Each structure stands twice: as structure tokens, then as C-alpha cells.
Design a protein with these regions (language model features):
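Radical SAM enzyme core and accessory elements
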Residues: 2-5, 36-41, 57-70, 92-99, ...
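Acidic, low-complexity intrinsically disordered segments
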Residues: 2-216, 221-223
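Hydrophobic/aromatic residues located in beta-strands of well-ordered beta-sheets
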Residues: 3, 72, 102, 227, ...
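Radical SAM [4Fe-4S] cluster-binding motif and immediate context
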Residues: 23, 157-323, 330
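A general structural detector for well-ordered alpha-helical segments in enzyme core domains, enriched
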Residues: 31, 56-59, 82-93, 211-214, ...
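Conserved strand-turn element in the central/C-terminal portion of the radical SAM core barrel
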Residues: 50-52, 262-264, 289-297, 312-339, ...
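Short beta-strand/loop segments at the ligand-binding rim of alpha/beta enzyme cores
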Residues: 94-104, 254-257, 321-324
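Catalytic cores of alpha/beta
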Residues: 113-115, 333-349
Length: 481
């Protein structure tokens, strides 16, 4: 058996322009690791959108050789924008290798059709992929015939957190990142959240040994030291941070991590600052959403504004080395424009965060996969929103967002207001980049100030392009060896 998993992250649209990708996705790495454990051969194709499609097809055909059991897959969990290009690649390969099986993985909605897709997995299905590859019956998990599509039961954790072991054929560098997970499951149930495993009181936590092995292998092979933590909430309990601190202690190098955290929990558990410092978790994404108590109660997140201000002051004072990014949702019922601007001005006046940004509330009312619908998506009226007939494409997942109105605004004006607030925060706080953007950039070009990073985006992208080109050349040589 030979398996290839193709993946690519979209260019990130920062407030200063497009930022090219320097991250490797953990899903493809983990699937390939699993195939090798099953006795097969496997490899990833990263930066798929940067390849010449004909050269890639020719190289893969050479690598497949005369193997009868061959599979090609793509990961749509983060970016499904290359599905059409992937379909073209598959058709080219099938001209000489008609036995090729095509797999779509991680998509949030059913994608493709049976004329070119053999099997599709919706959401997290690593356990089902393994069963399928080994020839076991997974029919009880099937949800569609066109293409044959499968998914795990809703909110039941059937697999373990991902901490991929990289392979020498990944041809990574110290200027790139990989993603790992400390746990699966988040005990919170925010009204706007549609993530897998939310409202789950029994998180599955990774072991120190597995995370150490993942990070240490990446360092030993490629010198990688920076890692995204993909957990929905890294600090919901102290034990997750204790695991990360122990991982950092056991590694032969000094790692650095970026993660999502809840600010209000840090306020309730100030000892978490020390744990984050021990772990070298210094880039933090706070989903603050709103500082209006009339909003935070309804969305089940946050608290009184003065308490939140005190928490930000504490983090700024006791954790000055941290890059803190706060994200806000514009248009939530219960908010108002005057109060919102007062809070934004307070953030800038006191420089309470390193960076902050916002986006207009999006409501998805007709997803094929209802499990990815938040409570607001499922019952907008209950939360004060009236849905109109108008829709618009919203983002790289292929979703259509519904236009809405509430007691103080509507989707159209919320987008306009969001743009104004976003630019105000970008200009008024030290950095114009989000936590993800900053972490990617400092991995690619470490040691610069926020002003310097803001001024050299074209240079950053040039370096990323050179990195990708070098990877592609090495991968072509390896596939054709």
C-alpha cells in the first residue's frame, strides 16, 4: 500500500496584505504516520497550491510505480479551496494508474461526487480512515452515497489528540511550524461556537511522552522549535498547562508555543501565568468577543468589563513577554455602537493587548452538517436575530452566511463597523498582526520588533516563497529517486 496526502494552507489575509504560509498540517502527517505503522509507504505533499500540477502528477506516478493498492487524499479541514485543483491532479494520475483510490478528509460539509471521489470523511475521522485502509466495515458511519461519506457520532471522542511524528521525507526546516494537540474536548459551550467536541466534560488529554516525541523528532530532523497548540481552550484546566510545562522541561531544546486561551480563566487562576511561562507559551489568542456584560451573559462567555480590564492589566504586568491578541465579534445582540467604541478606546489608551481585531457575526442557518452549527445558528430568534433571505459566501470552508438583523444593527452594517474597528485597533496597538500571523512571521524571521515586522511583509513573503521552492525541489527529487 502506498498513500499520498496532499495539503495546503491558504494565504492569510492580514491587515497589511497577504501572508504566505510556513506551517505543516498535522492531519496529513498523522495519517502518513498511521499508514507506516500499518506496514505501508506514505508521504505528504505540502504547499500543494505552489506546485506545477503536471510535474507533481508525473512525480507521484513515478513514486506509485506498479503498486496495486494506491491512495491519494487531501485535507480540507483548514482549507478546501484547492479541491478543484486536487480533482484535476487525480484525473491526470488515473490516466496511467486507474486503480488509484481518491479520499477526501476533514471536510466540514459533503464535497465532491462519486465520479471522482471514492470516499469522503467529514470532520475528525482518523479512526475511520484506519478501518477503511485495513478493509474493515464502516457502513454504520455512512451519511451519504454521493460521494460515499462517513463521519463519527456527534460529540463522542473516538480518537486521540494529534501529535505527529515527522518523517525525513517531509523536508521541513527550522523556519516552519507544525500543529500539535494537548487534548480533545472543550467543557465550554459558547453560543456562537460550532467547533467539534464543545460542551464536552471528558476531555481526552495527550501524554507528555507523545508530545515530547513529536516535538523532539521535529527538532532532531529539521531543527523546528515552534509549535501551534490547536486545542480550543488550552487553559480550561491547569492540568493541560502542567502537561505543556513538563513537555518543555523534558525537551533537549527550548520550544515556543502558541495557543488559544480564555482570559477570564486566567483571571480566576492567576497561577496559570507561571505555568505558561514554564511552558514557554508566549503567544496567546484570546477570544474575548465582547466587553459588554449584556452580551457576555447571552453568549456564555466573559464577564463584567472592569473585571476583564483588571485581568488584562495583570497579564500585561506579570507576563510582559507575552504576545496577546484579543478577538471581538461585532454585531452581537445586546451590544451598542457607543459602548463598543468606548471599550476599544480603553484598550488602545491603556495598551492592554499587543494586538486585537474583530469580525462581524456570521450565522450559518442551512449547513448540511448540523453538528457544525452553533446554538445561534440553530435558533437565531432565541438569541435575538432575524434571518433574511439574502446570503453570501463566507470564507474558505464553502459555507454561505445568512444575512441577519437584531435590535441595534444588521449584518451589512456590522461588517462596515467591523472594518472600522479592525483598522483602529491595528493602528492603535503595538502589532497589526494576529497571534497566528505573528507566530508564523517570527518563526520565519525571528528577532525583530513589531514595527519592523509591519514594514517588511514583502520580504517575509519572499522568504516563504524561497522556502516552499526549496521544499518542492527536494520532494521532486525524492519522489523520482
Amino acid at each position: 500500500m502506498k498513500v499520498v496526502i496532499v495539503s495546503s494552507l491558504a494565504i492569510r489575509g492580514t491587515r497589511l496584505g497577504g501572508l504566505d504560509n510556513n506551517a505543516r498540517l498535522s492531519g496529513p502527517l498523522t495519517i502518513c504516520e498511521m499508514v507506516r505503522e500499518l506496514g505501508g509507504e506514505a508521504t505528504t505533499i505540502d504547499y500543494f497550491d505552489k506546485w506545477d500540477i503536471n510535474i507533481l502528477a508525473e512525480s507521484l506516478c513515478k513514486w506509485f510505480g506498479d503498486e496495486k493498492n494506491i491512495v491519494i487524499g487531501t485535507s480540507g479541514s483548514v482549507n478546501d479551496g484547492n479541491t478543484i485543483l486536487f480533482a484535476r491532479l487525480c484525473r491526470i494520475i488515473k490516466e496511467t494508474h486507474p486503480q488509484l483510490k481518491v479520499m477526501l478528509g476533514g471536510y466540514r460539509v459533503i464535497t465532491g461526487n462519486a465520479d471522482w471521489v471514492d470516499i469522503s470523511f467529514i470532520g475528525r475521522c482518523r479512526n475511520l480512515v484506519k478501518e477503511w485502509l485495513t478493509g474493515n466495515d464502516i457502513s454504520k458511519y455512512q451519511i451519504s452515497d454521493n460521494p460515499p461519506s462517513f463521519r463519527n457520532p456527534h460529540n463522542i471522542i473516538k480518537e486521540e489528540p494529534v501529535s505527529p511524528i515527522m518523517h525525513h521525507s517531509d523536508f521541513a526546516t527550522s523556519e516552519e511550524l507544525i500543529t500539535i494537540e494537548l487534548s480533545l474536548g472543550c467543557k465550554f459551550n459558547c453560543a456562537f461556537c460550532g467547533f467539534d467536541y464543545r460542551n464536552n466534560k471528558r476531555a481526552v488529554v495527550n501524554t507528555v511522552e507523545k508530545v515530547v516525541s513529536s516535538c523532539q523528532t521535529a527538532y532532531d530532523l529539521f531543527g523546528m522549535t515552534n509549535f501551534f497548540i490547536a486545542d480550543d481552550t488550552i487553559n480550561e484546566v491547569n492540568s493541560k498547562l502542567e502537561v505543556l510545562a513538563e513537555v518543555s522541561k523534558q525537551l533537549s531544546f527550548t520550544p515556543e508555543f502558541m495557543a488559544f486561551a480564555r482570559m477570564d480563566i486566567m483571571g480566576a487562576k492567576p497561577e496559570q501565568i507561571d505555568l505558561m511561562q514554564q511552558a514557554n507559551l508566549k503567544t496567546i489568542f484570546f477570544g474575548i468577543e465582547s466587553l459588554n456584560p449584556a452580551v457576555t451573559k447571552d453568549i456564555r462567555k466573559g464577564g463584567k468589563p472592569e473585571r476583564n480590564y483588571d485581568i488584562m492589566r495583570m497579564i500585561k504586568r506579570d507576563f510582559p513577554e507575552a504576545f496577546t491578541y484579543g478577538n471581538f465579534i461585532i454585531g452581537l445582540e445586546g451590544d451598542n455602537e457607543k459602548g463598543m467604541w468606548e471599550h476599544m478606546n480603553n484598550l488602545v489608551d491603556e495598551q492592554l493587548l499587543t494586538s486585537a481585531g474583530c469580525n462581524a457575526l456570521r450565522i450559518y442557518t442551512d449547513l448540511d452538517n448540523w453538528e457544525n452549527m452553533s446554538d445561534i445558528d440553530r435558533d437565531p430568534a432565541k438569541f435575538g436575530y432575524t434571518i433574511t433571505d439574502k446570503k453570501e459566501f463566507a470564507g474558505q470552508y464553502g459555507y454561505d452566511a445568512s444575512h441577519w438583523s437584531n435590535s441595534w444593527t444588521d449584518y451589512t452594517y456590522a461588517k462596515q463597523l467591523s472594518n472600522s474597528v479592525d483598522q483602529f485597533l491595528a493602528k492603535g496597538l503595538p502589532s497589526s498582526y494576529t497571534a497566528h500571523e505573528h507566530f508564523s512571521i517570527k518563526t520565519l524571521m525571528p528577532g525583530m520588533s513589531h514595527d519592523e515586522y509591519s514594514a517588511i511583509l514583502p520580504i517575509i513573503n519572499n522568504k516563504a516563497t524561497m522556502l516552499q521552492s526549496t521544499y518542492i525541489k527536494k520532494k521532486i527529487d525524492w519522489l523520482n529517486a
